[in-house]
Amino acid sequence: MISKSSPLIFERSKKDRYAYSLPQNDIENISIASLLDDKYIRKHKAEFPEVSELDLVRHYTELSNKNFGVDTGFYPLGSCTMKYNPKINEKVARISGFSESHPLQEEEHVQGSLEIIYSLQEELKEITGMDEVTLQPAAGAHGEWTALMIFKAYHEKNGQSHRDEVIVPDSAHGTNPASASFAGFKSVTVKSNQRGEVDIEDLKRVVNDNTAAIMLTNPNTLGIFEQDIIEIGKIVHEAGGLLYYDGANLNAILDKVRPGDMGFDAVHLNLHKTFTGPHGGGGPGSGPVGVVEKLASYLPKPMVIKDNDRYKYDNDIPNSIGRVKPFYGNFGIYLRAYTYIRSMGANGLKEVSEAAVLNANYIKSRLKNHFEIPFNQYCKHEFVLSGTLQKQYGVRTLDMAKRLLDFGVHPPTIYFPLNVEEGMMIEPTETESKETLDYFIDAMIQIADETKNDPDKVLEAPHTTIIDRLDETTAARKPILKFEELKDEKYKEHTNIDSEDN
């Protein structure tokens, strides 16, 4: 959000002001009308802002100074693994042989790039315990959908097209039921037990002949390891279903236990989370999918294979669900992930998970006397606390999250998972120091104290940010999405905007 002191780029615009002039054209001008059908040609000039180079630079510099990311402060956003991204990743991604290549180049011209893709596939197979891996999916939810489409094709190939139900826990990521629906399945909820794990008896109740799969995160979204995972797999497999692993929480178990060893049939990973691709701002991400042998022939094509000492695309995948991403996915993220994996090595990845789990449990142990902790066992890489104690003073979890902004900390994930009242999900990752963790803990304790002794300070937060609280209801119901709308309504109250104009 831009403050009053930072006008929109359109508001900086002055007619005939420009940042750069092109040299005089020395070739014949050709009318665009002779090249394109009339329906593709603008009837009016695009209203681009006209600004000087200095104004342009200042505008984006001001905006960049208002950004918040893991490079500027602590970012304990639960279930998102907002870890530090090593800068060596960026150096490798900018090597000209990679950054200036084109996906339509001949295979013999991009052997280095294909080798990276192949090698990353092999690394991820080892990390996950899967038999084959595709890198094509563009992000986590895309990986979920890809795996579910593979499941669907597998069931149809085996005469089981009636299997149209996907089981998801009540603590699941919202993308799980959404991906299931998008893939043409119905979502069936399985309850959690008092330990925060899948309730085995309820699972037995919901599994039936229509079960296509169960989608699980392990550790789950509460940061708790599903101790009954082997039994869960047995129940679902005996019913003819498949096990899908949501890799959002893989950061907790690297080189400790693999999804394949737990009985999962498919897994998606988030290279932009666990493996330090830049995270946030809308992408690009990467959501590779790994599968066991019986599902390998359904993977998207092409795959990259090694043929003697050469690397090439392989389109000979008999039951493939087809291409799921133009070209071969987000290659720049592959470079960053591969650099990270090779830099860390197996022992380094194990230490990543150990430190992530240690950091989460340290915060949890220091906050347990100040907040309600729904599940008291040791957590993995993240945990969920509840703001119910503070709610009795009229303060909600949302208010405490806003107050954290005054401490220069990005708030944790709030009101998720849905089965924890006034939930706050905290994931510190492995890259934060004890000093940073202590600062966050002290801020949380201070806020807990303020809810009792000075609740207005929390209710009116944030106090130090460029803007305070947004009118989120009006923003959702009557959004102003274009500068023209803002210009038209400049002197009107936002709440008086006629929805028909939007």
Curated annotation (Swiss-Prot):
It is an enzyme of class 1 (oxidoreductase). GO terms for biological process: glycine decarboxylation via glycine cleavage system. GO terms for molecular function: glycine binding; glycine dehydrogenase (decarboxylating) activity; pyridoxal phosphate binding. The modification N6-(pyridoxal phosphate)lysine is found at residue 273. Keywords: Oxidoreductase, Pyridoxal phosphate. Pfam families: Aminotran_5, GcvP2_C. It comes from the Bacteria. It catalyses: N(6)-[(R)-lipoyl]-L-lysyl-[glycine-cleavage complex H protein] + glycine + H(+) = N(6)-[(R)-S(8)-aminomethyldihydrolipoyl]-L-lysyl-[glycine-cleavage complex H protein] + CO2. Its cofactor is pyridoxal 5'-phosphate. InterPro entries: Aminotrans_V_dom, GcvPB, GDC-P_C, GDC_P, PyrdxlP-dep_Trfase, PyrdxlP-dep_Trfase_major, PyrdxlP-dep_Trfase_small. GO terms for cellular component: cytosol; glycine cleavage complex. The keyword Oxidoreductase applies. Its EC number is 1.4.4.2. Transmembrane segments: none annotated. The glycine cleavage system is composed of four proteins: P, T, L and H. In this organism, the P 'protein' is a heterodimer of two subunits. The glycine cleavage system catalyzes the degradation of glycine. The P protein binds the alpha-amino group of glycine through its pyridoxal phosphate cofactor; CO(2) is released and the remaining methylamine moiety is then transferred to the lipoamide cofactor of the H protein. PANTHER family: GLYCINE DEHYDROGENASE (DECARBOXYLATING), MITOCHONDRIAL, GLYCINE DEHYDROGENASE, DECARBOXYLATING. Belongs to the GcvP family. C-terminal subunit subfamily. This is Probable glycine dehydrogenase (decarboxylating) subunit 2. The gene is gcvPB.
